[in-house]
């Protein structure tokens, strides 16, 4: 079983315009939800996530997100892709 660790940063700017700027800068907006905690908006490096998705185990394995130095165990619930480009648009993670 593969061990997936991704670095993430908390997002302060929310909304469509902010998300577009992040995507142009090579980042993916994402949200982490579930459990007793509030939902958290984060951003991930596009190329690292895209590389991880090439392994089919990514979609069924527990993923460790390193959010500003704090570890969080999650699974991926949704991954939005661009219709014809090899680009990721958004990711949803659920806490384990």
Swiss-Prot record:
GO biological process: translation
Chain coiled-coil ranges: none
GO molecular function: 5S rRNA binding; structural constituent of ribosome
One cellular-component annotation, GO: cytosolic large ribosomal subunit
Keywords recorded for this protein, A-Z: Ribonucleoprotein, Ribosomal protein, RNA-binding, rRNA-binding
CDD domains: Ribosomal_L25_TL5_CTC
Tree of life domain: Bacteria
Pfam families attached to this UniProt entry: Ribosomal_L25p
Function: This is one of the proteins that binds to the 5S RNA in the ribosome where it forms part of the central protuberance.
Assigned protein family: Belongs to the bacterial ribosomal protein bL25 family.
Subunit description: Part of the 50S ribosomal subunit; part of the 5S rRNA/L5/L18/L25 subcomplex. Contacts the 5S rRNA. Binds to the 5S rRNA independently of L5 and L18.
NCBIfam families for the chain: bL25_bact_ctc, PRK05943.1
Name this polypeptide is given: Large ribosomal subunit protein bL25
Name of the gene encoding the protein in the UniProt record: rplY
